Protein backbone atom coordinates (compact mmCIF):
# COMPACT_ATOMS: atom_id res chain seq x y z
CA UNK A 1 0.00 0.00 0.00
CA UNK A 2 2.90 2.30 0.80
CA UNK A 3 4.48 1.82 -2.66
CA UNK A 4 1.13 2.51 -4.29
CA UNK A 5 0.90 5.86 -2.49
CA UNK A 6 4.45 6.71 -3.53
CA UNK A 7 3.66 5.92 -7.15
CA UNK A 8 0.52 8.05 -7.04
CA UNK A 9 2.45 10.88 -5.43
CA UNK A 10 5.13 10.63 -8.11
CA UNK A 11 2.53 10.75 -10.90
CA UNK A 12 0.80 13.70 -9.24
CA UNK A 13 4.06 15.62 -8.89
CA UNK A 14 4.95 14.91 -12.51
CA UNK A 15 1.59 16.15 -13.74
CA UNK A 16 1.82 19.26 -11.60
CA UNK A 17 5.33 20.03 -12.82
CA UNK A 18 4.25 19.64 -16.44
CA UNK A 19 1.21 21.81 -15.85
CA UNK A 20 3.24 24.45 -14.04
CA UNK A 21 5.95 24.53 -16.71
CA UNK A 22 3.35 24.97 -19.45
CA UNK A 23 1.46 27.69 -17.64
CA UNK A 24 4.63 29.59 -16.79
CA UNK A 25 5.74 29.48 -20.42
CA UNK A 26 2.27 30.22 -21.76
CA UNK A 27 2.53 34.03 -21.83
CA UNK A 28 5.53 33.79 -24.12
CA UNK A 29 3.60 31.92 -26.80
CA UNK A 30 0.16 33.48 -26.70
CA UNK A 31 -1.04 36.34 -28.87
CA UNK A 32 -0.43 39.84 -27.54
CA UNK A 33 -3.22 41.11 -25.41
CA UNK A 34 -5.51 43.92 -26.40
CA UNK A 35 -3.99 46.08 -23.69
CA UNK A 36 -0.94 47.81 -25.16
CA UNK A 37 1.53 50.24 -23.75
CA UNK A 38 -0.20 53.06 -25.62
CA UNK A 39 -3.48 52.42 -23.85
CA UNK A 40 -3.81 54.69 -20.90
CA UNK A 41 -4.88 53.44 -17.60
CA UNK A 42 -5.98 56.45 -15.61
CA UNK A 43 -4.67 56.61 -12.14
CA UNK A 44 -5.48 59.09 -9.46
CA UNK A 45 -3.06 61.67 -8.20
CA UNK A 46 -1.15 62.13 -11.45
CA UNK A 47 -0.68 65.65 -12.62
CA UNK A 48 -0.44 66.84 -16.21
CA UNK A 49 3.40 67.16 -16.59
CA UNK A 50 3.87 63.63 -15.29
CA UNK A 51 1.40 62.33 -17.84
CA UNK A 52 3.19 64.18 -20.69
CA UNK A 53 6.58 62.71 -19.79
CA UNK A 54 4.92 59.35 -19.32
CA UNK A 55 3.34 59.65 -22.76
CA UNK A 56 6.73 60.41 -24.36
CA UNK A 57 8.26 57.39 -22.66
CA UNK A 58 5.37 55.22 -23.82
CA UNK A 59 5.76 56.49 -27.40
CA UNK A 60 9.47 55.61 -27.37
CA UNK A 61 8.70 52.14 -26.03
CA UNK A 62 5.99 51.62 -28.64
CA UNK A 63 8.37 52.59 -31.44
CA UNK A 64 11.00 50.23 -30.10
CA UNK A 65 8.45 47.44 -29.73
CA UNK A 66 7.05 48.06 -33.20
CA UNK A 67 10.54 47.66 -34.65
CA UNK A 68 11.11 44.48 -32.63
CA UNK A 69 7.75 42.96 -33.58
CA UNK A 70 8.82 42.67 -37.21
CA UNK A 71 10.60 39.46 -38.10
CA UNK A 72 14.36 39.68 -37.85
CA UNK A 73 15.17 38.27 -41.25
CA UNK A 74 15.72 40.11 -44.46
CA UNK A 75 14.49 38.53 -47.68
CA UNK A 76 17.39 39.81 -49.74
CA UNK A 77 19.84 38.44 -47.18
CA UNK A 78 18.23 34.99 -47.41
CA UNK A 79 18.36 35.14 -51.20
CA UNK A 80 22.05 36.04 -51.11
CA UNK A 81 22.72 33.21 -48.68
CA UNK A 82 20.88 30.70 -50.88
CA UNK A 83 22.82 31.94 -53.91
CA UNK A 84 26.08 31.57 -52.01
CA UNK A 85 25.27 28.02 -50.91
CA UNK A 86 24.28 27.08 -54.46
CA UNK A 87 27.41 28.64 -55.94
CA UNK A 88 29.63 26.88 -53.41
CA UNK A 89 28.07 23.47 -54.00
CA UNK A 90 28.05 23.95 -57.78
CA UNK A 91 31.72 24.91 -57.86
CA UNK A 92 32.57 21.83 -55.76
CA UNK A 93 30.66 19.66 -58.23
CA UNK A 94 32.42 21.23 -61.21
CA UNK A 95 35.77 20.71 -59.51
CA UNK A 96 35.01 17.05 -58.95
CA UNK A 97 33.91 16.59 -62.57
CA UNK A 98 37.03 18.29 -63.93
CA UNK A 99 39.23 16.18 -61.65
CA UNK A 100 37.46 13.04 -62.85
CA UNK A 101 37.93 14.02 -66.52
CA UNK A 102 41.59 14.83 -65.91
CA UNK A 103 42.14 11.48 -64.22
CA UNK A 104 40.41 9.65 -67.06
CA UNK A 105 42.56 11.48 -69.61
CA UNK A 106 45.72 10.52 -67.69
CA UNK A 107 44.60 6.90 -67.50
CA UNK A 108 43.84 6.89 -71.22
CA UNK A 109 47.24 8.35 -72.06
CA UNK A 110 49.01 5.84 -69.85
CA UNK A 111 47.25 2.85 -71.38
CA UNK A 112 47.69 4.07 -74.94
CA UNK A 113 51.32 5.10 -74.42
CA UNK A 114 52.24 1.69 -73.00
CA UNK A 115 50.79 -0.11 -75.98
CA UNK A 116 52.25 2.20 -78.62
CA UNK A 117 55.69 2.64 -77.04
CA UNK A 118 56.51 -0.89 -75.93
CA UNK A 119 54.66 -3.73 -77.68
CA UNK A 120 57.46 -6.21 -76.78
CA UNK A 121 56.18 -7.10 -73.25
CA UNK A 122 52.77 -8.02 -74.65
CA UNK A 123 54.40 -10.30 -77.24
CA UNK A 124 56.67 -11.80 -74.58
CA UNK A 125 53.70 -12.57 -72.39
CA UNK A 126 51.77 -14.25 -75.18
CA UNK A 127 54.87 -16.26 -76.12
CA UNK A 128 55.28 -17.39 -72.53
CA UNK A 129 51.64 -18.45 -72.31
CA UNK A 130 51.95 -20.41 -75.55
CA UNK A 131 55.16 -22.10 -74.42
CA UNK A 132 53.63 -23.04 -71.08
CA UNK A 133 50.52 -24.52 -72.72
CA UNK A 134 52.60 -26.39 -75.30
CA UNK A 135 54.86 -27.87 -72.61
CA UNK A 136 51.84 -29.00 -70.62
CA UNK A 137 50.34 -30.63 -73.71
CA UNK A 138 53.58 -32.50 -74.48
CA UNK A 139 53.74 -33.80 -70.91
CA UNK A 140 50.14 -35.00 -71.09
CA UNK A 141 50.81 -36.77 -74.38
CA UNK A 142 53.90 -38.47 -72.90
CA UNK A 143 51.86 -39.66 -69.90
CA UNK A 144 49.18 -41.05 -72.22
CA UNK A 145 51.76 -42.91 -74.30
CA UNK A 146 53.40 -44.36 -71.20
CA UNK A 147 50.08 -45.49 -69.70
CA UNK A 148 48.99 -47.03 -73.02
CA UNK A 149 52.25 -48.90 -73.28
CA UNK A 150 51.91 -50.29 -69.76
CA UNK A 151 48.24 -51.20 -70.16
CA UNK A 152 48.70 -52.86 -73.52
CA UNK A 153 51.91 -54.60 -72.51
CA UNK A 154 53.94 -53.01 -75.26
CA UNK A 155 57.60 -52.36 -74.70
CA UNK A 156 60.23 -50.15 -76.23
CA UNK A 157 60.83 -52.69 -78.97
CA UNK A 158 57.67 -51.51 -80.69
CA UNK A 159 58.84 -47.91 -80.98
CA UNK A 160 57.95 -46.51 -77.57
CA UNK A 161 60.51 -44.44 -75.77
CA UNK A 162 62.07 -46.19 -72.75
CA UNK A 163 63.15 -42.83 -71.34
CA UNK A 164 59.73 -41.66 -70.15
CA UNK A 165 60.89 -39.81 -67.00
CA UNK A 166 63.35 -37.85 -69.12
CA UNK A 167 60.53 -36.77 -71.45
CA UNK A 168 58.51 -35.42 -68.53
CA UNK A 169 61.41 -33.31 -67.34
CA UNK A 170 61.69 -31.43 -70.64
UniProtKB/Swiss-Prot annotation:
The keyword Nucleus does not apply. It comes from the Eukaryota. Residues 21-79, 156-170 form a propeptide. The modification Methionine amide is found at residue 107. Residues 1-20 form the signal peptide. The modification Phosphoserine is found at residue 76. The modification Asparagine amide is found at residue 152. GO terms for biological process: adenylate cyclase-activating G protein-coupled receptor signaling pathway; body fluid secretion; epinephrine secretion; G protein-coupled receptor signaling pathway; mRNA stabilization; positive regulation of cell population proliferation; positive regulation of protein catabolic process; prolactin secretion. One of its GO terms (cellular component) is extracellular space. Keywords: Amidation, Cleavage on pair of basic residues, Hormone, Phosphoprotein, Secreted, Signal. Gene3D superfamilies: 6.10.250.590. One of its GO terms (molecular function) is neuropeptide hormone activity. It is found in: Secreted. Pfam families: Hormone_2. PANTHER family: GLUCAGON-FAMILY NEUROPEPTIDE, VIP PEPTIDES. PHM-27 and PHV-42 are two bioactive forms from proteolysis of the same precursor protein, that cause vasodilation. PHM-27 is a potent agonist of the calcitonin receptor CALCR, with similar efficacy as calcitonin. Belongs to the glucagon family. This is VIP peptides. It comes from Homo sapiens (Human). The lineage of its organism: Eukaryota, Metazoa, Chordata, Craniata, Vertebrata. The gene is VIP.
Amino acid sequence: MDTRNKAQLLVLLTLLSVLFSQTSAWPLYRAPSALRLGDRIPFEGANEPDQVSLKEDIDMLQNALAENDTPYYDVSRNARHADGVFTSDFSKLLGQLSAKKYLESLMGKRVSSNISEDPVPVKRHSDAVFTDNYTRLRKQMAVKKYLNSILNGKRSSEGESPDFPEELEK
